[in-house]
């Protein structure tokens, strides 16, 4: 394996970093259960990756649907609490410091089995996941009911394939 092509062509570095301060308000709330911080979006990283802090603040509510992505990997790093991680074969309790990498096509899901929990979620390459998260938030907030076909269309539009 070799290094990828150069992305910066200047002879000297530049001041271009972006700092996210802990304690910042979430960028999005999905119902009473999830708060999402957009740390680095696919757009802000030039499509290299998307990184989000996902805080599950509400009580657990059922088992989430397992799914996979065709265009990107997804990784989870547990920050606090217990995150239930499904690796396509079994559920495991992820504790702070635990990490799960899921390549494209890998079946996965997550939940908070025992109360509040936080994790970092990384998509690579970066994709416009914010649009998907925001549509989910709108559906939850409005109480809008989707047909099975509408759910399928939403999922497929955002590279999410339920199993």
Feature roles, as predicted:
Residues 24-66, 72-73:
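A short glycine-rich, His/Asp/Glu-containing loop-to-beta-strand
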Residues 62-63, 83, 131, 139:
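Hydrophobic small-molecule pocket/channel-lining residues, especially in calycin-type beta-barrels
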Residues 132-163:
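Acidic/histidine-enriched, glycine/proline-rich intrinsically disordered or flexible terminal extensions
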Residues 53-58, 68-87, 122-124:
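Short, conserved beta-strand element in jelly-roll/cupin
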Residues 27-29, 89-107:
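Short acidic-glycine-tyrosine-enriched beta hairpin
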Residues 1-40:
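Long, hydrophobic/aromatic N-terminal blocks
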Residues 64-66, 87-92:
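Short beta-strand segments
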